[in-house]
Amino acid sequence: MTKVTAQLSVSVDGFYAGPLFEGDGNWMDSAESAGFFRVTRWATEVSAWRERQGFAGGEQDTNSEVIAETFEAAGAYVMGRRMADGGEVPWGDEPPFRAPVFVVTHRPRETLLRQGGTSFTYVTDGVASAVEQARAVAGGKNVAVAGGGSLVRQVLKAGLLDELELHVVPVVLGTGLRVFDADLDLADKEAIELTPTRVLHTPQVTHIRYAVNGRAPLVLDDRGSGGGPTATR
């Protein structure tokens, strides 16, 4: 059964990139200074990621197994235009996806065909259309929302996301771009409810997978000590 999934590497305080990540320019050029590299470094050091990028070596450990599992489960991808444009040159003629990629954008462009099974189709009629087109060609495998963070929030807000995995890196950035920002636009006393389904801990990163249950009202639950608002369905 096809699931729509998303994964993001984040700091303990919830940032997936630092403040310099905003603004114009190629995000790949500014990634290291923006703190992006600090929360994704764990992935670049493992063999599964390096093999997809055409590099040798790398650690063969739990983190590598998580990366390999993610690639193998994906039958199609959805990503934002900024990520696609920023990756076009460094990914080269054989990008790591090896599957159709649907790029959410306001600017039309012809489909790009690359070696290894990767194609980039530019979708101008919204995130729901991109997800539906990806689902249609995923062959029963997952539709992976590759990012960036703004696109993940759009998919979550639209109720299209089935599974979210956060890779929590033991670092505090203090400022930058948050995974869950105000543009989720939740109503007053409303929450998006998640159920943890897997936790894998390593010294470099903790992988927490959630099933996305959808929106639910926040009500006052005074059972037990302390009470406080909780999400109920």
Predicted regions and their residues:
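Enzymes that bind and transform nitrogen-containing heteroaromatic metabolites
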Residues: M1-R233
